[in-house]
């Protein structure tokens, strides 16, 4: 972006209902406002076409959000769209108001002017594969369902601790479907007192549980109950009766979401570019899945949240977006290296899972982890060091186009360049 081939610079302050747009052509700003609707976006595109005399390639548009309906419409009509981190935009805003004044028209002007004067702070937004868009939505929905599942399980566990802790001896987290079936059939110690061994055998058989027998489970459940105040058991069982259907629903949706992610990853792996000689995305999927420690959820999250760095083979952007690269603050003789907090938190969580898994299945990764732990580094910091190495290896594999082989790991590209 050293020499921008653009004549018109436009800033868009995005809104749920209205978009404030400022264009800078020849140093003179023009402000317009458009509704967030089909008619409003069409009017915005028409206005931009008039400004550039039907040459959309000469228009550069700055906006905070890298995704959305407005961005898709602008890209579809051939405009160049650039995104910026909101924190960086806040710093640029100080140029126009020392007092910190802020409004929509000023933000649109700041975006347009900053893109013209400081293009290196912006990142160009490229059109995305429809499969990547679907995968991103499904992977984010899966993460939300995981959070809901954990929250509901914690609520169930709290209720069981009040009056029926024997169930937690069978499943400490209370997150297994067979435990929910058990509670539907026997919701209280009073009900368990009249339970038969055959009833528990049926539940265990339906859910294929073999680590505990029906006799052992019955013995645990029939142990002396907690002495509780009158009404506690009734209140807790009613609360659990409300939780169980929600837990079953969220668990089914989570399973369906995971299956959908697997299908999308497989479909993406089978996709070939139409133009001969270009890199095929399905090869990238194969290479990613060949890395030790990478499972379906991690692969889907990395492909969805870090698609551009993977396509561009940009190791530095990938480690920065995932929170692996540290932040160094140095002034005079003082030097402080800290964890990076400004990153894609979904991608960072995926890298954390990947790091945990690779330490269990790869001896070299485990040795590197232990080396950092011996230096009194925390578990998370040691995992970031492991993942820094893994991302470098991943990029080397992507550049060479070869699958990862543990005994013949590629050496080219491991110089952090």
Where are these regions (language model features)?
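A detector of single, family-specific signature residues
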Residues: 1-417
């Amino acid at each position: 972006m050293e020499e921008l081939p653009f004549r018109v610079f436009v800033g868009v302050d995005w809104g749920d209902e209205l978009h404030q747009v400022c264009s800078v052509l020849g140093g003179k700003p023009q402000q317009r406002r458009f509704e967030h609707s089909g008619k409003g976006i069409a009017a915005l595109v028409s206005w931009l076409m008039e400004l550039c005399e039907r040459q959309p390639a000469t228009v550069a548009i700055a906006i905070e959000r890298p995704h959305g309906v407005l961005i898709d419409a602008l890209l579809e009509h051939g405009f160049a769209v650039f995104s910026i981190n909101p924190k960086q935009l806040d710093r640029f805003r100080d140029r126009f108001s020392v007092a910190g004044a802020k409004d929509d028209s000023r933000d649109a002007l700041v975006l347009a002017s900053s893109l013209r004067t400081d293009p290196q702070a912006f990142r160009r937004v490229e059109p995305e594969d429809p499969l990547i868009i679907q995968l991103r939505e499904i992977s984010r929905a899966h993460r939300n369902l995981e959070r809901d599942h954990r929250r509901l399980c914690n609520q169930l566990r709290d209720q069981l601790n009040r009056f029926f802790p024997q169930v937690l001896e069978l499943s400490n987290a209370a997150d297994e479907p067979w435990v929910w079936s058990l509670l539907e059939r026997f919701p209280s110690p009073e009900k368990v007192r009249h339970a038969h061994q055959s009833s528990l055998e049926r539940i265990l058989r339906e859910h294929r549980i073999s680590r505990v027998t029906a006799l052992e489970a019955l013995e645990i459940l029939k142990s002396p109950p907690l002495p509780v105040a009158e009404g506690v058991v009734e209140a807790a069982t009613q609360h659990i009766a409300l939780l169980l259907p929600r837990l079953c629903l969220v668990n089914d949706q989570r399973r369906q979401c995971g299956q959908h992610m697997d299908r999308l990853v497989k479909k993406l792996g089978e996709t070939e570019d139409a133009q001969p000689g270009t890199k095929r995305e399905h090869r990238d999927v194969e290479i990613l899945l060949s890395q030790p420690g990478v499972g379906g959820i991690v692969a889907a999250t990395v492909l969805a949240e870090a698609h551009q760095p993977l396509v561009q083979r940009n190791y530095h952007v990938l480690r920065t977006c995932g929170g692996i690269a540290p932040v160094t603050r140095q002034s005079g003789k003082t030097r402080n290296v800290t964890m990076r907090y400004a990153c894609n938190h979904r991608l960072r969580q995926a890298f954390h899972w990947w790091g945990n898994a690779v330490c269990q299945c790869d001896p070299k990764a485990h040795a590197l982890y232990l080396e950092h732990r011996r230096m009194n580094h925390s578990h998370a910091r040691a995992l970031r060091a492991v993942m820094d190495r893994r991302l470098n290896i991943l990029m080397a594999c992507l550049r060479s186009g070869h699958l990862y082989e543990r005994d013949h790991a590629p050496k080219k590209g491991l110089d952090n360049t």
